[in-house]
């Protein structure tokens, strides 16, 4: 994958995260403040905990930082997969967000 393809796929992922947060805020009592600055999205929960998602263009990776730890993802044909075999990006983001929000949440593409 070249830089242009990476940025296109990565930007689509960040937009999907923001759209998922808007949907969750509209449909549930969860309150997720989604803040975008350049190639980074920060999700702030009502308990003030945060999840940070940012693009690592030189590595063609997306990094996710949550209370449970840090995760790195590379695009593999159709999805973003953890570089250490820990699963798919949106499944892990949903798990981390649910833990930090204290209620079940689903973020997806």
UniProtKB/Swiss-Prot annotation:
Q: Which PANTHER family match?
A: FRATAXIN, FRATAXIN, MITOCHONDRIAL
Q: Which SUPFAM superfamilies match?
A: Frataxin/Nqo15-like (SSF55387)
User: What GO biological process term is on the record, naming one?
Assistant: iron-sulfur cluster assembly
- Give a Pfam family name: Frataxin_Cyay
What is this protein's name? Iron-sulfur cluster assembly protein CyaY
SMART domains per record: Frataxin_Cyay
Question: What family name appears in the similarity comment?
Answer: Belongs to the frataxin family.
Q: Which organism is it from?
A: Albidiferax ferrireducens (strain ATCC BAA-621 / DSM 15236 / T118)
| Function field | Involved in iron-sulfur (Fe-S) cluster assembly. May act as a regulator of Fe-S biogenesis.
Single GO cellular component annotation? cytosol
Q: Where on the tree of life does the source sit, at the highest rank?
A: Bacteria
Any one GO molecular-function label of the UniProt entry = ferrous iron binding
Q: Which UniProt keywords apply?
A: Iron, Metal-binding
